[in-house]
């Protein structure tokens, strides 16, 4: 059980790092991008174009793209897929997914370092919370694929690894919850069985044994005793 929760915490920590990287793509930094296409570099909060002097010219930072957006040099947005620009508004699921994953990591750490790890209720809540976390990670990856198709860069592909990692954590949390519930049920059953047994003191057992031994030597009288017993007749003289 201890090793399993350690694995969950480790995987969630790695997943959190994977989900942070898309948030620091262009134009936040100029070294990472979700996708690159024809000198266009796309990030979570905008997009950039590399000019003739190899300098990136970016749009203002905001979630989602706009067909009227232009960079500082007047370039117009061009997506690598045929998706409508309005789909880019779904990129908002990235920070939401990061918040859920971070919360799930905190819950896993609490389970690992506190006695709440033996609580079926706490494990049930954490396992249930992992379900929307997994769905949000999966939605992030699907949105990235829908927008950028085969032009997805490695920070975007990390969302696939994050989705698989959260799926493994979700499965292990449900297994942990099942194991703890079974152990608690078996403990309650053993306590109930012990309480239902009659308890005798040593003196009571000894007294009962003595009564049993003495009764073995007692012979109950029968109706034949009167036939076997001799009759004594007094014969005398009457003066």
From Swiss-Prot:
Extracellular side: 25-90, 150-155
A Pfam family the protein falls into: SUR7
GO CC, alphabetical: cell division site; fungal-type vacuole lumen; growing cell tip; plasma membrane
Localization annotation: Cell membrane
Topological domains, Cytoplasmic: 1-3, 112-128, 177-239
InterPro entries named in the record: pH-response_reg_palI/RIM9 (IPR051380), SUR7/Rim9-like_fungi (IPR009571)
Membrane topology recorded in Swiss-Prot or TrEMBL: Multi-pass membrane protein
Gene Ontology biological process: ascospore formation
Transmembrane segments: 4-24, 91-111, 129-149, 156-176
Chief localisation class: membrane
Keywords: Cell membrane, Membrane, Transmembrane, Transmembrane helix
Function: Required for the proteolytic cleavage of the transcriptional repressor RIM101 in response to alkaline ambient pH, which is necessary for sporulation and invasive growth.
Family: Belongs to the palI/RIM9 family.
PANTHER family with a match to the protein in the record: PROTEIN DCV1-RELATED (PTHR28013:SF3)
Protein name: pH-response regulator protein palI/RIM9
Species name: Saccharomyces cerevisiae (strain ATCC 204508 / S288c) (Baker's yeast)
Recorded name of the encoding gene: RIM9
């Amino acid at each position: 059980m201890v090793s399993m929760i350690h694995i969950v915490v480790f995987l969630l920590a790695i997943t959190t790092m994977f989900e942070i990287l898309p948030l620091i793509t262009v134009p936040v930094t100029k070294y990472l991008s979700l996708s690159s296409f024809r000198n266009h570099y796309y990030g979570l909060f905008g997009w950039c174009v590399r000019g003739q002097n190899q300098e990136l010219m970016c749009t203002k930072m905001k979630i989602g793209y706009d067909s009227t957006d232009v960079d500082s040099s007047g370039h117009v947005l061009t997506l690598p897929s045929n998706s409508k620009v309005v789909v880019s508004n779904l990129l908002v699921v990235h920070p939401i997914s990061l918040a859920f994953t971070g919360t799930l990591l905190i819950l896993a750490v609490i389970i690992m370092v506190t006695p709440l790890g033996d609580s079926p209720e706490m494990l049930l809540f954490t396992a249930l919370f992992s379900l929307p976390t997994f769905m949000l990670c999966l939605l992030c990856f699907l949105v990235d694929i829908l927008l950028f198709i085969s032009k997805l860069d490695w920070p975007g592909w990390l969302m696939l690894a994050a989705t698989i990692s959260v799926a493994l954590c979700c499965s292990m949390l449900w297994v942990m919850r099942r194991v703890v519930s079974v152990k608690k049920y078996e403990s309650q059953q053993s306590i109930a069985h012990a309480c239902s047994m009659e308890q005798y003191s040593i003196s009571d057992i000894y007294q009962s044994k003595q009564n049993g031994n003495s009764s073995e030597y007692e012979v109950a009288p029968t109706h034949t005793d009167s036939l076997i017993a001799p009759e004594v007749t007094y014969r005398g003289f009457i003066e």
